Structures are given as structure tokens and as C-alpha cells.
Amino acid sequence: MHTINSDLRNTDPDISFLINQELLRQQTHLELIASENFASEAVMEAQGSVLTNKYAEGLPNKRYYGGCEHIDAIEQLAITRAQTLFNAEWANVQPHSGAQANFAVFLALLNPGDTIMGMDLSHGGHLTHGSPVNVSGKWFNAIHYGVDQTTKVLNFEQIRQVALKNRPKLIICGFSAYPRTIDFKAFRSIADEIDAYLLADIAHIAGLVACGAHPNPVPYCDVVTTTTHKTLRGPRGGLILCRDKEFGKRFDKAVFPGNQGGPLEHVIAAKAVAFGEALKPEFKTYTFQVISNAKALAKRIQERGISIVSEGTDNHIVLLDLRSIEMTGKKADSLISEVNITANKNTVPFDPESPFVTSGLRLGTAALTTRGFTEKAFIEVADVIADCLLNPEDLSIKEQCKAKVIDLCNRFPLYNSNQ
């Protein structure tokens, strides 16, 4: 007879085994995917709680279901902490993802066929910023700006000219693979010139923004969206922020009933825990270490003769341009995976290769910094990556690299306290 009191190992040994295998993989690999991080055990405890049982359509104290008094308190804590963290007057913590946060903004501000302007995906933008394969590029007239061909950084006069020519109703500033600081004030000036809304998608840099390691878009943008994982180190989910409470009500309605039903209150509780962690001084220390580590990683890789897009980084992202060593991103990704390093192939600006092959490799320092890596350890990581990429056919070097990775994993253990 089935009982809800049976644990996972007894109820479903197959899933239990696979979860433990994934834990082992995370513990024995170096995680350099820029969009990933390691949530705390407290965050995971909240997400795996009895809150998963509760339906709570609506907002705190305005629900369509009974029995929400504790849910209301939890969600209000998440809202208040998010407002404090980002100095925002309004927040909605219900979006299931960053993509759904963006769609809620589109629903609130746009009509099908309106013109939107975002960063070109191949230059570091995101699918939801108007890519033709995404609903944002199918429902709206999407135009794009990119980086300067020489410097590989944003050229605001070029962006201004694109905006003046096309006069979009919404400008999106944000990225998934841009390693430099975003000047939100400059974007605001362009948006004001054409009377456009301005959306900042800070999914990758939210943790940096929260701690003052990157400028805050809230004072300059009409609305801000983000994920709650990545550099914020929370559960996988979305968040919408706004500097004006009345304007924010548009997005409340766009989230529910606009494009979601019941919120995931177990995830919202985990968001609240993560926001609470991010408000502590040690998280600020962590965030600045993330950036220092990225700079050390980029510098060492350049010293080994591999080019870096824009010649460096201001955040957690290091984007390798592998044309400098006549290698594709697909090949590089495969090589480092053989020595237990996970990253991802990525297009670089003006990439001659297809998105399935690419000329780039995107690295991020957030996850390994959570494990305790500092600059010295990241120099070791850079050398392992360079050794792999510069000696693709040397099996002895490959074995040495894998041994170094295992040593680094042992020196900086993950989730070892209760395992």
C-alpha cells in the first residue's frame, strides 16, 4: 500500500539513484556554466517543503483560496526582502522563470505587432529579447543592436541611431553573454528621446547589482526582470521589480491571471531565503570575489594565448574567442568535458560559425566561487583549460588535467556536511 510517509529511496529507488548520481557529478566536476550556481541547503530545504501542497492564486491577502495565512506571510517576506535588496518600491516574486517575467512585461506594456529592440542573440543577448525562434520575435517586430565590431562593447551612439530609425515601443537592455558593465543611464536617455519603455533584464548580474558590484537599473528603468538563481544563488525562478507601485500593478495582473495560474509557493519561500542570504554582509564579500575571480581567470587565459572577447570582464562572465587558436566552441566544450569541466559553447560577436558550432566558449565564476575558489585556484583552472585546448591530441596532458580537476574538487568540497 502506498504511503506518503515513505522516503524517496524506498518509494522510487530509480529517481533516488539518479539524484545521487547528479550530486556526485556536481561534486566531482568544475562548474563553469555562467548561468549556474549552487543554492544553499537552506534554500533547498525551503523548496522541498510542505508548501508544495498549497494553491494560492492571487496576491498576499487577496487570494482565491482559503488557508493562505502562512503562505501570505512567506510571500510578503519574499516581496519585502526583494524590495530592500534592489531598492525597489514594488516587486512580484511569482514568475516561474526569467522568461515568464519577461513575457509578463510584454503582456502589460505591448500589443502584438509592436516594435521591440534588444541585444542581438549572437552578440550576447537572450532568446526572449526578440529572437525569431522565440515568441518575443514572433509576436513582435523585433529589431536588434549589437556591440562595436572593433571594441566588442556597446556603442551607445550606434544604439541610439538604431532606436531613432525604428522607434521601438520597448527597449530591452540585458544579456546572457556580455562581459562588461551596462550603462543604464545611457539607455534611459535613448528611451526618453523616442518615448519608449525601458526594460532591464538583469538575470545574469542580479547578485552583483544587489551588492553594489554593478550599477542598479531600478532608478533608470521602467521595469526590471531577473532570474533568482545564477549570481543571486537562489532557486530557479523569476522576479519583476519596479520603482513605482502604481505602475507595478500592471505587472501583477500580467503575471496572474495574465500568463500564470497558481504560484509555486515552495519556490517563493526558497526565493525569500535566498534574498535573506543576499542581504547579509558575507554575500557582498562573495559577490566581489566572483568578479575578482573572473578577472583572474580572464587574465591567465589571455596570458596563455587565447583571446577574450572585449579583452576582459567586469562581471562573472569570461567569453573566449577560440578563433585565436583555430578551434570551434563545440570542439572546446567537448575537450574540457572530458576532464570534468562543464561550460558551454557560445557565439561570439560577428561569429562566422553557426549557433550549433560557434567560435566561443562561455565561462562563469559564480558556482566555483560558492565552493570557495579564490583567484589562485582560478589561475589553476585557467591553466587546466588552456592545457586542454592547446594540446587537444595529447592523452597524457588530458590525464594530468583530469587529475588536477579532481584535486581541486577535493580541496573545495560541495555539500559535504550532511552527505
From Swiss-Prot:
Its biological purpose: Catalyzes the reversible interconversion of serine and glycine with tetrahydrofolate (THF) serving as the one-carbon carrier. This reaction serves as the major source of one-carbon groups required for the biosynthesis of purines, thymidylate, methionine, and other important biomolecules. Also exhibits THF-independent aldolase activity toward beta-hydroxyamino acids, producing glycine and aldehydes, via a retro-aldol mechanism.
Subunit structure: Homodimer.
GO MF entries: glycine hydroxymethyltransferase activity; pyridoxal phosphate binding
Protein name in UniProt: Serine hydroxymethyltransferase
Domain of life (superkingdom): Bacteria
Main localisation: cytoplasm
Keyword check for Ion transport: no
GO cellular component, one term: cytosol
HAMAP family assigned to the protein according to its UniProt record, in alphabetical order: SHMT
Pfam family, one: SHMT
Record PTM N6-(pyridoxal phosphate)lysine, positions in chain: 230
Native organism taxonomy: Bacteria, Bacillati, Cyanobacteriota, Cyanophyceae, Synechococcales
CDD domains registered for this protein in UniProt: SHMT (cd00378)
Residues under site feature: Plays an important role in substrate specificity: 229
Keywords: Amino-acid biosynthesis, Cytoplasm, One-carbon metabolism, Pyridoxal phosphate, Transferase
Cofactor (UniProt): pyridoxal 5'-phosphate
Gene3D superfamilies recorded: Aspartate Aminotransferase, domain 1, Type I PLP-dependent aspartate aminotransferase-like (Major domain)
Subcellular location: Cytoplasm
Positions that bind (6S)-5,6,7,8-tetrahydrofolate: 121, 125-127, 354-356
Family listed: Belongs to the SHMT family.
Enzyme superclass (EC): transferase
Pathway in which this enzyme or protein is active: One-carbon metabolism; tetrahydrofolate interconversion; Amino-acid biosynthesis; glycine biosynthesis; glycine from L-serine: step 1/1
Gene Ontology biological process: glycine biosynthetic process from serine; tetrahydrofolate interconversion
